[in-house]
Structures are given as structure tokens and as C-alpha cells.
């Protein structure tokens, strides 16, 4: 028991890095995903096609590969030539990748709204922006909560990929202790950390779903 307690400090430090990446990614990817979704359903076919290509690229290639490209290959790209530090490179990769996934969730939510509501809003004199803001998006939020919950939980687990950039996240901290002490106990404790984080997220999304369900009654 004393050994397990001694692991909490180092693993908590790693969990801090994990949570930091998780929060920053959400703050960037959710609004970017919404913008991409609105562009995806836009009447401008060129814009819609461009966004569709972006989503295809980000969803069709591994997140780890994107992260390695941004960190190691970006400096050699003409015009850009910027080398990002480890953590910012991870943030950029995660935000761009998850924005594509969130965009598809938002797009499905937007397109699930009955077309008659758009026509009704038009009769009332609402602009496209007002229709989206007052009618479509509020209903969309309620419908996308389950897939958003799944994707957000996946994000927590995907943060472990940043070990390839030598960032001392939760998994890397556990791995270092395992190699030092020749025991798998740190992995079990790290798993408990991940389970607690996903449990909190699951509880939060369930509360949101219940709250919206009450409004529908």
C-alpha cells in the first residue's frame, strides 16, 4: 500500500500534462469543428468540398503520424519553416485532428433538423445566421451529446500518444517507474487515473443529457 501511495505524486504530475492537453484541445477543437461543420453544409460548393477534403485527410491518417509531421517535418515545409516545441506541436495536432471529428458530429446534428424549421424561420423573417443561432444549433446540441461524449472520452485516452514526443504525460510517467522498479503496478495505478477521468466525463455528459431530456418533457 505504501508503494502505491508513493506512486501518486509522480503519476499526478503526469496526469496534469494529460489534463492540460485535453482541456486545451477541447477549447480549440470544438469551436473549430463547429466552423468546419457550418462550412461543410454551406451552399458554397468550393468551400464545402475543401472542408470535406480536410476532414477526409485528418480522419484518414493516424493522429500519431500527424503529430510527428507537425513536430519534425513542418520546419522543412516551404514558406512555413517553423519548428514547434513538443507540447505546442501536440496541441496543434490534436486540435486539428479532433476538429475534423467534431465537425462531422456537428454536421450530422445540423442536418438532422427538419427542413421545415428552416422554412418556418424564413417566413418569420429570420436570416440564415439567426436561424442557425436561435433554432438549429440549440436543437443540435441536444442530439449530439451521445457522440460528443464518446469522442471526448476517446480524446482522454488518445492523449497517451504524446509519449512519442517525449512529453512526460501520465502514461510516460508510469512507464518510467515500471522500468525503474521492474513492476507493473504503476500501469495499474495509471489505469485508475484514466478511469477516474473518463468516469467524471461520463457523469457530466449523462447529467447534460438528463437536463435536456427534462426540457423536452
Predicted regions and their residues:
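Transmembrane alpha-helices and adjacent helix-loop boundaries
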Residues: 1-217
Amino acid at each position: 500500500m505504501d508503494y502505491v501511495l508513493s506512486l501518486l505524486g509522480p503519476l499526478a504530475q503526469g496526469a496534469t500534462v494529460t489534463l492540460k492537453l485535453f482541456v486545451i484541445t477541447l477549447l480549440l477543437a470544438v469551436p473549430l469543428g463547429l466552423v468546419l461543420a457550418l462550412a461543410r453544409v454551406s451552399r458554397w460548393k468550393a468551400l464545402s468540398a475543401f472542408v470535406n477534403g480536410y476532414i477526409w485527410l485528418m480522419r484518414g491518417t493516424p493522429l500519431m503520424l500527424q503529430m510527428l509531421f507537425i513536430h519534425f517535418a513542418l520546419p522543412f515545409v516551404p514558406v512555413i519553416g517553423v519548428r514547434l516545441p513538443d507540447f505546442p506541436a501536440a496541441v496543434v495536432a490534436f486540435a486539428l485532428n479532433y476538429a475534423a471529428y467534431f465537425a462531422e458530429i456537428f454536421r450530422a446534428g445540423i442536418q438532422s433538423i427538419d427542413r421545415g424549421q428552416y422554412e418556418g424561420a424564413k417566413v418569420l423573417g429570420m436570416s440564415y445566421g439567426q436561424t442557425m443561432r436561435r433554432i438549429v444549433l440549440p436543437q443540435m446540441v441536444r442530439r449530439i451529446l451521445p457522440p460528443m461524449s464518446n469522442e471526448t472520452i476517446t480524446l482522454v485516452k488518445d492523449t497517451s500518444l504524446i509519449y512519442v514526443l517525449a512529453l512526460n504525460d501520465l502514461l510516460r510517467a508510469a512507464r518510467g517507474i515500471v522500468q525503474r522498479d521492474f513492476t507493473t503496478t504503476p500501469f495499474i495505478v495509471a489505469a485508475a487515473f484514466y478511469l477516474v477521468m473518463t468516469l467524471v466525463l461520463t457523469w457530466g455528459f449523462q447529467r447534460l443529457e438528463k437536463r435536456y431530456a427534462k426540457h423536452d418533457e
